[in-house]
Amino acid sequence: MLYNINELKVGLKVIQNKEPYVIIKNECIKPGKGQSFNRVRFKQIKSGKILEKTLKPGDLVESANIVETELIYVYRDRDLWFFMNRDSFDQISVHFDILGKSVKWMVEQLVYVVVFWDNNPILVIPPEFIKLKIIKTNLITKNISTASGNKLAVVSTGAVVKVPFFIQSGELIKVNTHSGSYISRIK
């Protein structure tokens, strides 16, 4: 399906440079003299790169066949991560290269959003907050009760997170996967 510039709106998924993009800004400009045009800002779905284009009346933009599906992460086998559909129990595999930075937030039995383009997975989005166990923390030699600040901790997925000094190995914490930051301790 092709869209003309009057049909473009924020959130629409389209093809630009043979890659899937989402429109994040669409501004219609009507100069005092001459034809109106649209200044459109696109964000590449896979990498997050921003593309800005000026479109004139008559320009057509191709729609992208993008589907976002909630799937449960089941297990890993070498470079493949396997996800299962909750309704049909169908399993799909996602290669390590597609996971990208999400790999450090992969916890079995959690629900992830898998983005498909023409029935091929292109992106895995972890839940915003996840619970993780602290495996190892840096030893602090100062008096912890008077110290303020953070130390580094390795969590069960292998990710490194800055945590407050009072957090010890073996504790559960809540982490924001989008920023990679510590949110709270879970008791």
Curated annotation (Swiss-Prot):
Pathway the protein takes part in: Protein biosynthesis; polypeptide chain elongation
Statement: the UniProt record of this protein carries the keyword Cell cycle: no
Record bears the keyword Protein biosynthesis: yes
Main location: cytoplasm
A single GO molecular function term of this UniProt record: translation elongation factor activity
Keyword list, A-Z: Cytoplasm, Elongation factor, Hydroxylation, Protein biosynthesis
PROSITE patterns given in the database record: EFP (PS01275)
InterPro entries noted in UniProt: Elong-fact-P_C, NA-bd_OB-fold, Rib_uL2_dom2, Transl_elong_fac_P/YeiP, Transl_elong_KOW-like, Transl_elong_P/YeiP_cen, Transl_elong_P/YeiP_CS, Transl_elongation_fac_P
GO cellular component, one term: cytosol
Known function: Involved in peptide bond synthesis. Alleviates ribosome stalling that occurs when 3 or more consecutive Pro residues or the sequence PPG is present in a protein, possibly by augmenting the peptidyl transferase activity of the ribosome. Modification of Lys-33 is required for alleviation.
Protein name: Elongation factor P
Source organism of this protein record: Blochmanniella floridana
